[in-house]
Structure formats: C-alpha cells, structure tokens
C-alpha cells in the first residue's frame, strides 16, 4: 500500500534529535531513533500502522514530516487521529518556555537547558503501556528491564509485515490477560511481576480498573493514589506511570536510583543522596520538577559537561 505523508508543526522550541534520543538504543522491530529518523508501530482504528518521523524545520520553527504505512488503505479521518498520536507521543503542543523561566534562578539547571534547548519528554501512547513498563522496571537496571519489555512485546504484541520486515506493537490488556504465568516468566519476568501484569490486564477487561477514569482526575496526587490501589503498584511505579504515560510534569519519582544519581551528579558532586534529599533539591523546580528531572537524566546520559 502506498504510504501517506503529512507535516506537523510543533510549539517551539522543539528538538526532535534530543527528544527522540532516548530511543536510540531501541529495538528496530519495535521503536527506534537512528540517523534523524524515528519509527514505531501504533494502533489506529483496529489496524496497525508504521510511523516514520523526521524533522524538516528548526528548533525555533519546528516541523515534522510523518510517513504512515499500513497493509490497508488509511482513511483521511484516521490520518487526523494518527497526527494526534504523534503530537501526544512527542508532547508537541507543550509550552516549554514557562519551564525555562521558572527555573532560571537555578544556575545549574539553566546551563543544562542551554545545552538541551527544545527537549520535550516523550509520552507513551497509553497509560497501560506506561504502567506495564514501570512494573517491569521495578528494582532492575534499565538495560535488563528494556530487554524484558522487548521480549514481552515480541512474544505477545500484534505484528505487521512491511517490505519483508516484521514490526511489533505493544500488547493490549486483551493480549496479556489470559496468558499462563509461565508464558510471561519466559520473557524474564519474576513470578510476582508476571502476576501483577496479568492481573492488571484482567482487571481492565473486567472493568474493575478504569485507567480512562484515572486520566480524568484533576490532581497528580489523586492519580497516584488511584494507581497505588493496583496490586504491585507502589508510589514509585505510579509516579513513573503518570510522568511517562500522562505527562504529569509535577511527578518526581525520587525513589528512582537513576534519577537520584543524575541529581547528585550535577548538584551534589556524585555523593549518594536519599529520596528526601532529592525532593528537597527538586523544590527549586516547582511544578516542573518531573521535567527538570528528565533534563538531568538526559544530560547525564549524554555526558554533558556544564562547567565549560
């Protein structure tokens, strides 16, 4: 089927290279950023589509070119829906300048922002995906967790074949709810995590857990409290889920070892800090503390030296 193409403008500033760089080590059959191109399979109207996204603008005048490929004809109404998904995934409508103004008195953060101008935090297509990933990542290194996540996706997610390449989409609750626990464990999950994932999927299908209702809550704290009612979901998991799945930028997963390490690297001379100490430092960032934490993680990942 002939691919469809369209352009999307983003609220400036926006830098695709910085914003998608977190996917540079991704699995090319699932989601990856390489040589200025990002691609991922998504669901649209019960069909799978492969998106390829490239930048055609500048940081202060950002524009993206999106190519959509599918096995089926894509209706114009579905292209609009796909456009909205791209806007959500890369947070294209977010006004980021107020964040820069808010933290301008923090000299360290100000210097990091100068190097990462236009970085926006990606958001998962669904809250379910953010929850599952956060459960998988409990008490694991990111490398180990991503390996397990990829195995879950390739084992149970739907796939699409295009030009002799197979691509996989994230599993839905329907894909996971009725699995044998051993099937999930074969992906590298512990027995408990396999239980949590299957039980969460089943509770969504049985309408016992309403993730859409969680999204409609006004306050981040209420969202976290609601998610913590799910078996296997504690405060850290819920904070990670609302930050990466709903873009709640006031959520700071201070119990995260990687985040504390990045905060310490830039603010405390790499001395180990506690969750409370991380929260104390984060008070400087107000309602933007989750985004500020993300900037620190990316800066640390890139090995930025802000002393020069």
Residue ranges of each PLM-predicted region?
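HhH-family (HhH-GPD) DNA N-glycosylase catalytic core used in base-excision repair
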Residues: 1-308
């Amino acid at each position: 089927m002939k691919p469809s193409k369209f352009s999307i403008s983003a609220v400036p500033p926006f830098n695709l290279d910085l914003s998608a760089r977190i996917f540079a080590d991704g699995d090319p059959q699932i989601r990856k950023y390489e040589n200025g191109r990002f691609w991922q399979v998504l669901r649209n109207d019960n069909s799978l589509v492969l998106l390829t996204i490239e930048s055609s603008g500048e940081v202060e005048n950002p524009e993206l070119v999106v190519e959509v490929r599918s096995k089926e004809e894509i209706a114009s109404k579905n292209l609009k829906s796909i456009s909205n998904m791209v806007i959500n995934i890369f947070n294209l409508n977010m006004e980021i300048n107020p964040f820069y103004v808010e933290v301008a008195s923090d000299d360290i953060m100000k210097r990091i922002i100068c190097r990462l101008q236009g970085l926006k935090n990606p958001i998962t297509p669904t809250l379910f995906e953010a929850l599952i990933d956060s459960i998988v990542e409990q008490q694991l290194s990111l490398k180990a967790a991503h390996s397990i996540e990829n195995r879950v996706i390739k084992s149970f997610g739907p796939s699409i074949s295009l030009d002799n390449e197979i691509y996989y989409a994230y599993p839905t609750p329907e894909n996971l709810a009725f699995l044998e626990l051993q099937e999930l464990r074969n992906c590298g999950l512990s027995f408990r995590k396999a239980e949590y994932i299957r039980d969460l999927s089943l509770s969504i299908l049985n309408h016992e857990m309403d993730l859409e209702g969680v999204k409609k809550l006004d306050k981040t704290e209420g969202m976290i409290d609601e998610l913590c009612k799910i078996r296997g979901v504690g405060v850290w998991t819920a904070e990670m889920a609302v930050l990466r799945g709903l873009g709640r930028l006031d959520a700071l997963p201070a119990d995260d070892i990687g985040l504390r390490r990045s905060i310490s690297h830039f603010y405390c001379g790499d001395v180990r800090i506690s969750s409370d100490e991380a929260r104390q430092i984060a008070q400087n960032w107000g309602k933007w503390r989750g985004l500020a934490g993300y900037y620190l993680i990316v800066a640390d990942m890139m090995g930025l030296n802000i002393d020069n």
